[in-house]
């Protein structure tokens, strides 16, 4: 009899401890959402925009924890080393999940091996802008000027390895032109010097410069997206301007540490996709210049690998590497 009771209890423990059972009860406590950047940036905004809907759907608080530093490596390393139980997740950027893998020689985490990807949340294109004092007002004029004046065109960026910096590198590779990179500590400083005419051109986030464009403080030459930007309908895409294979988006997405039970991954990913499509969240993100993607874990994982390969090729060709 005692053996029978023990067997029944053991079987019950197996069922209760199974991944499916864990997912059914998940989450049973607050979930930490790491943001590997300071408050107020794109990843931070994306993460905070979905937490109310997640809390409502899943019945637990989602606590945003900013862990900035080392171009997002500090926060990403914290996620990689966390317990893979679904109670620690992260919202990161194209840099966190793709560019850093190719850019840094001694990266403290591996984007392709340390994480399970949940959903690519949002994306937004860059816009190629020029100082009003710069002679070129179209992509063709810029390329022509750059070829006639080797290494004279200055490209401002928010920092080495940023999406705006690598957009400039890719642009020069595609057009077989030259230029000088001028990295700043953030996009704000780069934009200020661009408006002041201290630098010539830059690839900047649409939302960050559209008001300056509309006010006539900057000239917009082209959009890096596959379609024209809703807020800048008169600005052509790079493809329309004759530059092929240069569709570039900055993007944010969500991940958990590798080893998180699949049922928990599926439940959290579905909740995130639903939260991103929630009307108010969707409207808020669109108003900030983001396009909601909300794809599946498999789609995001495949996209992440494609992005790593793409930017690794660009970075290696340009011989860029950071310690």
Model-derived features: where do they sit?
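Stable alpha-helical elements in mature extracytoplasmic
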Residues: 42, 46, 50, 54, ...
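Sec-dependent signal peptide recognition
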Residues: 2-10
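N-terminal (or domain-start) structured segment
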Residues: 23-114, 151-152, 160, 175-203, ...
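C-terminal segment of classical bacterial N-terminal signal peptides
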Residues: 8, 14-22
């Amino acid at each position: 009899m005692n053996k029978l009771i023990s067997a029944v209890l053991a079987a019950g423990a197996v069922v209760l401890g199974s991944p499916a059972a864990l997912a059914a009860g998940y989450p049973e406590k607050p979930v930490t959402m790491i943001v590997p950047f300071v408050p107020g940036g794109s990843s931070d905004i994306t993460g905070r925009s979905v937490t109310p809907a997640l809390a409502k759907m899943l019945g637990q608080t989602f606590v945003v924890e900013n862990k900035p530093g080392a171009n997002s490596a500090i926060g990403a390393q914290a996620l990689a080393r966390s317990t893979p139980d679904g109670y620690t997740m992260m919202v990161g950027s194209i840099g966190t999940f793709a560019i850093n893998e190719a850019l840094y020689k001694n990266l403290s985490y591996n984007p392709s091996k340390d994480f399970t990807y949940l959903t690519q949340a949002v994306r937004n294109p860059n816009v190629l802008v020029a100082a009003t004092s710069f002679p070129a007002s179209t992509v063709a004029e810029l390329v022509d000027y750059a070829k006639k004046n080797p290494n004279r065109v200055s490209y401002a960026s928010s920092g080495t390895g940023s999406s705006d910096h690598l957009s400039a590198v890719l642009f020069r590779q595609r057009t077989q032109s030259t230029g000088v990179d001028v990295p700043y500590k953030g996009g704000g400083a780069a934009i200020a010097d661009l408006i002041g005419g201290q630098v010539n051109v830059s690839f900047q986030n649409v939302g960050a410069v559209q008001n300056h464009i509309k006010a006539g403080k900057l000239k917009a030459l082209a959009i890096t997206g596959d379609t024209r930007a809703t807020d800048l309908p008169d600005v052509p895409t790079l493809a329309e301007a004759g530059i092929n294979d240069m569709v570039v988006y900055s993007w944010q997405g969500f991940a958990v540490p590798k080893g998180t039970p699949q049922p928990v991954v599926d439940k959290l990913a579905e909740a995130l996709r639903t939260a991103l499509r929630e009307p108010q969240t969707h409207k808020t993100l669109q108003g900030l210049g983001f396009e909601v993607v909300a794809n599946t874990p498999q789609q995001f994982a495949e996209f992440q690998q494609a992005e790593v390969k793409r930017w690794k090729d660009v970075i290696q060709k340009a011989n860029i590497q950071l310690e």
